[in-house]
Amino acid sequence: MNFHQSVSLLIVCFFGSAFLYAQEEHFSNKESYLFQRNTAVASFFEGEWQASSAHRRQWASVTVPFITSTLYLNKKFHLSNRAVKLHAGLLYIQDQSGDAELTIDNFLAHVGGTYRYLQHQFSANTQFGIVSKQLSDGNLTMPGQFDRETGGFNINLPGGENLESTSLSFFDLNLSLGWQYRWNQKWQVGSGLTVRHLLQSEASFLEENNQIPMGVGVQLFATYFVNHKNRLKPILYDYRRKKSSETLFGVEWEHDLDQYKAFFDRFYLGAYSRQAIGSNTDALILGGGIEFNAFRLGAAYDINLSDLDLASENRGGIEIQLIYTGKIRSLKKIAIPCEHY
């Protein structure tokens, strides 16, 4: 496959999807992945509340970059029954897709709860909100606009597509479940289940009717406590929607540092692979970061290994993530004054 064929394939796969139900946003940092796909599992964090921001930039080596940004907030609420906690939060994702100038805004809220029984934690969550899509077709070219005389695309030629509108919005509903279990001193394991787009809303810029297919995701994760300073965290996240799929698997190494000898508390390094049904590895993901006080700062880089590697020169995308976790407040000891006689 030569360079021009690779670029053409990229255009068909990404820009063409703007007219149907565009490919869902995906993240390389495992925390951002859960914030988007399973807030039930994401609610297992140790703390009172959590806020996160992430920024992803990809395909800059081929065309106008695809940019995805997200803001996330999750807050826990205590009940009289200490085994039960409620949680609620917000998620905003904006995805801007290259030359098609397709902008997707997700405004989502979630509510749910967690229940602790012995060494088990169970969580359930409902996520709902509005998804808005806007398309600017001024810079978009279709296969029918290829001009053989010039060897390029001509926007003045008919594209063969009838746009009904350049903006749309719909209500979205997602459900997620989570389970976590402290098996022994060495192992903690967990799993999650996600069902997305339950309403299968209409979302097409064309005159045709195209429903968003329902998506189902499964998450498997664990923590192996090597010793008091080192942990290994393997994951396997799988998500499938109609004929598309995304499987993310790999492992993260986390190491605690002596707080008196370093300006941060710990660092972590991870390596992951992203694959799809019937294809080889789509991308190799290398990531890492540090934790200091209540902050977790991380970055991940995608090395493109798909059929588009010739056009992209193996450069996929880079993602930056910042998480703040509000710690559990400890009770202050109050000295009760007494009178002296």
Task: Write out the residue ranges for each language-model feature.
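Short loop/turn motifs that connect adjacent beta-strands in outer-membrane beta-barrel proteins
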Residues: 41-48, 78-85, 99, 116-122, ...
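N-terminal, post-signal peptide beta-strand-biased segments of exported outer-membrane/organellar beta-barrel
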Residues: 20-87, 322-324
